[in-house]
């Protein structure tokens, strides 16, 4: 954390096909070893499949899926007098998006389908219907926060 003034977040260029900053961030999360063009191909192919499946606009379906995965609360470890408590804290909007995207990509990578584009399309489809591994991850995080609600007064 800086002592003088807060750092402005870097501006991210919107993606070339849909003009969405959120989708550009998602492409960056999916990217491996700096191979952005491959990541773009995978995401656009997955979004085309998703749009055909849901019958909605591709970007609209993507945002609906991301909405169902974004966490609202999470737990952070806090040490108090020799014991460690899992303290529930609210998640900032930027971190909400980042966690949701990361969970979707991780869940897609763990799936057993043929190509990454198909795995991503299936995971996004499941997420838009409130099922799948990414949604389960969010439910687990929310359950942990609910179970540790008694320690909420240790927030900082």
Curated annotation (Swiss-Prot):
Q: Which InterPro entries match?
A: Ribosomal_uS7, Ribosomal_uS7_bac/org-type, Ribosomal_uS7_CS, Ribosomal_uS7_dom, Ribosomal_uS7_dom_sf
Q: Which GO terms describe its molecular function?
A: rRNA binding; structural constituent of ribosome; tRNA binding
Q: Which Pfam families did the record assign?
A: Ribosomal_S7
What parts of the sequence cross the membrane?
none
Q: Which domain of life is it from?
A: Bacteria
Record-linked SUPFAM superfamilies: Ribosomal protein S7
The entry's family comment says: Belongs to the universal ribosomal protein uS7 family.
Known function: One of the primary rRNA binding proteins, it binds directly to 16S rRNA where it nucleates assembly of the head domain of the 30S subunit. Is located at the subunit interface close to the decoding center, probably blocks exit of the E-site tRNA.
Q: How does it assemble?
A: Part of the 30S ribosomal subunit. Contacts proteins S9 and S11.
Tell me what this protein is called.
Small ribosomal subunit protein uS7
UniProt organism field? Pasteurella multocida (strain Pm70)
Q: What's the name of its gene?
A: rpsG
């Amino acid at each position: 954390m800086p002592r003088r003034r807060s750092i402005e977040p870097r501006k991210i260029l919107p993606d070339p096909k849909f003009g969405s900053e959120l989708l550009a961030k998602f492409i960056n999360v999916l990217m491996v070893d700096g191979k952005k063009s491959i990541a773009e191909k995978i995401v656009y192919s997955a979004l085309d499949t998703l749009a055909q499946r849901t019958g909605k606009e591709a970007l609209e379906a993507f945002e609906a899926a991301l909405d169902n995965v974004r966490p609202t609360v999470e737990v952070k470890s806090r040490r108090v007098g020799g014991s460690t408590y899992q303290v529930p804290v609210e998640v900032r909007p930027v971190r909400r998006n980042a966690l949701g995207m990361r969970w979707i990509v991780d869940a897609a990578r763990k799936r057993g389908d043929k190509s990454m584009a198909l795995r991503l399309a299936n995971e996004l489809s499941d997420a838009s219907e409130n099922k799948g591994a990414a949604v389960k991850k969010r439910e687990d995080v929310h359950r942990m926060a609910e179970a540790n609600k008694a320690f909420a007064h240790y927030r900082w």
